[in-house]
From Swiss-Prot:
Coiled coil: 483-510
GO terms under cellular component: host cell endoplasmic reticulum-Golgi intermediate compartment; host cell plasma membrane; host cell rough endoplasmic reticulum; host cytoskeleton; membrane; viral outer capsid
Organism in which the protein naturally occurs: Rotavirus A (isolate RVA/Cow/Thailand/A44/1988/G10P8[11])
Gene3D superfamilies (UniProt xref): 1.20.5.170, 2.60.120.200
HAMAP family hit by this protein: Rota_A_VP4 (MF_04132), Rota_VP4 (MF_04125)
Protein name listed in UniProt: Outer capsid protein VP4
Spike body and stalk (antigen domain): region residues: 247-478
Length: 772
């Protein structure tokens, strides 16, 4: 009778209302289609007819001098002239291969008498003799060819303009200017000593000149630099339009203007504040387990001053690429466990969508030349105490990341009431001190920012900087770009969904066990499932369609396609490993396997666990006359939905889909092979026992591998530990034992009607796992 409701969802998840499907396809098309409109980015709809306005055009002269650049030490590209313009005397150039050739150039000022000077060049203190009795500057080259040799003067350049140029060809030979610019013997000389990858040290400001323009470089050596070093644009436009402006931090500049449209450059200082939010969900049971600690998107509104004007800003922060950790101290109900908790690591990104009420965001639809600069943000985690019923509380504390601005794009920010065209700033995460830990556990010295308390003692995190963009806007400032803007797009669906989850989980205590068992032992169908929710059959059909559409994208539905391959792979992995050794009589199979058997058995444990997770789908797709875990899940869903105060057609499909995937995470499945039973759990436990005496025997991995693909999988509603406990305390017949192993509904109901505490406690524990 295995879970008819979920079986119907699976088989019918691709049969939905045609009108709903057409609407869904239309929405996806709107979302995914991109219209190319030139150099502008599009966020929604373009005007019917528009142009870029008047555009400045003309010829651009190539910039001859690229620079000046600050002093540099690197493997500079070859086949370029590097024109140095030092402001002081001393070493202006050095170069070596650290084995057979050392060279540096010393600038000697005019009218310098002969003297000895000490210089520090290439990590070496050198004494040299300098002399320049003339009225021009002298660039003197000093060279040596062995480490023990002294530097000697080789060539020089006398120039009135304090300029010298260097070039390295493809083989690594260095060329520079020799002679004198005033005596007509200025020439280019080459030191033939190929060193392709040697580092060149330029200790003065320098310019870069293409090798093809060596003649221009020579003219600069002779005549000096031109008066102004900027790119020259020759643009034939009217004097009424042409103007020169210096951009200020907060300014609107009209780039071009036509009758209907104009391009405006917006420059803005910006202060970004954001607040991380999280979901902390406590699992069912005795209060020692947490199912999820995760980040969630969060909105934040604030004000700040910009040039004396108050700015109202709105941000939405979200994360991507988080690392998911877990921690489990053991299988007992009183063992502390965190099933999943998010941590921001080096591979994570933080996205902040920013909007403010300034003119820049009023028409942010067609945008180009978007740039931004922001400072770093350091985020330090705080303390979060896990409130246990008994004993000392574990405390998660510490953790830190540094957010570095990475890029900026356009985005649409959804608030509770409107959608806003925004800027999305992406920050890259880098871990920092201190690490985080959980007191009283093995979790320590881990780096990153956990989601338990990412804000620490901070009210908000803040990043300051500026952005600039060019936007195409209507020429009339009273008009607004015709887009679907400022409409109600959602009424905080996330908040409503959280409230429904909370109400759904709180109903666990109000469910009568006898009523639930009776319901779980009945074959539910789609309409009995929704009968307590919708009043008419037609409404139930529509609601069922919505559930199917949601269920179609669930992990459970997707895993059916890969079921056969997954089970076969699991069986193959087990059969290739060695057979398990006998378990000692004093060792319980419910203790940690790794403490009892060798590392080879760990392979079997891991593979058996993987197979156990797939057994649910295998059981799900085959007929089974006993009670399954999904029958209990469906019964809990139906009972809770009947008690919900608010029924929302948009939210309930999400709840049902989550329930199908998350209810009863700790499951056990068994395969019966004559008088022998093989049982594996999703927690990594595996063992074999006899049906006659419940005595544990050797787990034959090869036989288990043969049974995996062919035998019927049974939900171990009453697991081995519970059956053994029942037999030891009350005694059960062989027939009762076999029916219990097959999860027979009549036998389960009879034990519950007799108020058997062991069976009732087991069922109650399963129901407590039905939380999302």
């Amino acid at each position: 009778m295995a879970s008819l409701i979920y079986r119907q969802l699976l088989y019918n998840s691709y049969s939905v209302d045609l009108s709903d499907e057409i609407t869904n396809i239309g929405a996806e098309k709107k979302e995914n289609v991109t219209v190319q409109i030139g150099g502008f980015a599009q966020s929604q709809y373009a005007p019917v007819s528009w142009g870029s306005g008047e555009t400045l055009s003309g010829n651009v002269e190539e910039q001859t001098l690229d620079g000046p650049y600050a002093p540099d030490s690197s493997n500079l590209p070859s086949n370029c002239w590097y024109l140095v313009n030092p402001s002081n005397d001393g070493v202006v150039f050095s170069w070596t291969d650290n084995s057979t050739f050392w060279m540096f150039t010393y600038l000697v000022l005019p009218n310098t008498a002969q003297t000895n000077v000490t210089v520090n060049v290439m990590n070496e203190t050198v004494n040299i003799s300098i002399d320049n009795s003339g009225s021009t500057y002298r660039f003197e080259d000093y060279i040596k060819t062995s480490p023990t040799q002294s530097y000697g003067s080789r060539n020089y350049l006398n120039t009135a303009h304090r300029l010298q140029a260097y070039r390295r060809d493809g083989d690594g030979n260095i060329s520079n200017y020799w002679g004198a610019d005033t005596q007509g013997d200025l020439r280019v000389g080459t030191y033939s000593h190929p060193v392709p990858n040697a580092v060149i040290n330029l200790n003065a400001d320098f310019y870069v000149i293409p090798d093809s323009q060596q003649e221009i470089c020579t003219e600069y050596i002779r005549g000096g630099l031109p008066a102004m070093q900027t790119t020259t644009y020759v643009t034939p436009i009217s004097y009424a339009v042409r103007s020169q402006r210096v951009a200020r931090p907060n300014e609107d500049i009209i780039i071009s203007k036509a009758s209907l449209w104009k391009e405006v450059q917006y420059n803005r200082d910006i202060v970004i504040r954001f607040v991380f939010a999280n979901n902390i969900i406590k699992a069912g049971g005795l209060g020692y387990k947490w199912s999820e600690i995760s980040y969630k998107a969060n909105n934040y509104q604030y004000t700040y001053m910009r040039d004396g004007v108050e700015v109202v800003a709105h941000t939405t922060v979200s994360v991507n690429g988080v690392s998911v950790y877990n921690y489990n101290t053991g299988p007992l109900p009183t063992d502390f466990m965190i099933r999943n908790y998010d941590v921001l690591k080096e591979s994570s990104f933080v996205y902040v969508d920013y909007w403010d009420d300034s003119q820049a965001f009023r028409n942010m639809v067609y945008v180009r030349s978007l740039n931004a600069e922001l400072n770093q943000v350091r985020c330090v985690g705080g303390h979060y105490s896990f409130a246990l019923p008994v004993g000392s509380w574990p405390v998660m504390q510490g953790g830190s990341v540094i957010l570095t601005f990475d890029s900026v794009t356009l985005s649409t920010q959804f608030t509770d009431y409107v959608s806003l065209n925004s800027l999305r700033f992406r920050f890259r995460c880098a871990v920092s001190e201190p690490p985080f830990r959980v007191t009283g556990t093995r979790i320590s010295n881990l780096y990153g920012l956990p989601a338990a308390n990412p804000m620490g003692d901070q009210q908000y995190y803040e990043a300051s900087g500026r952005f600039s963009l060019i936007s195409l806007v209507p020429s009339n400032d009273d008009y607004q770009t015709p887009i679907a803007n400022s409409v109600t797009v959602r009424q905080d669906l996330e908040r409503q969904l959280d409230e429904m989850r909370r109400e759904f989980n709180e109903l666990s205590a109000n469910i009568a066990l006898s009523q639930l068992i009776d319901l779980a032992l009945l074959p539910l169908d789609m309409f009995s499932m929704f009968s307590g929710i919708q009043s008419t059959v037609e409404a139930a059909k529509t609601f069922a369609t919505s559930v199917m559409k949601k269920f179609r994208k669930s992990d459970l539905a997707k895993s059916v396609n890969s079921l056969t391959d997954a089970i076969t792979d699991a069986a193959g992995s087990i059969s290739r490993s060695s057979t398990l050794r006998s378990v000692n009589s004093v060792a319980s199979v419910w203790t940690d396997i790794s403490d009892i058997v060798d590392s080879t058995d760990n392979v079997v444990a891991a593979t058996a666990t993987a197979a156990a997770k797939k057994f649910r789908v295998k059981e799900f797709t085959t007929e089974f006359n006993g009670v399954s875990f999904d029958d209990i899940s469906a019964a809990v869903v139906k009972t809770k939905m009947n008690k919900l105060n608010v029924v929302d057609e948009e939210l309930l499909p999400q709840i049902i889909t989550e329930a199908s995937e998350k209810f009863i995470p700790n499951r056990a499945y068994r395969l019966i092979d004559g008088e022998k039973v093989y049982e594996v759990t999703t927690e990594g436990k595996y063992f074999a026992y006899l049906t006659e005496t419940f005595e544990e025997v050797v787990f034959d991995a090869e036989r288990f591998a043969e049974l995996v693909t062919d035998s019927q999988v049974i939900s171990a509603i009453i697991d081995f530990k519970t059956i053994k406990n029942l037999n030891d305390n009350y005694g059960i017949t062989r027939e009762q034992a076999l029916n219990m192993l097959r999860s027979d509904p009549k036998v389960l109901r009879s034990f519950i009607n007799q108020n058997n505490p062991i069976i009732k406690n087991r069922i109650e524990q399963l129901i407590l796992q039905c939380r999302i």
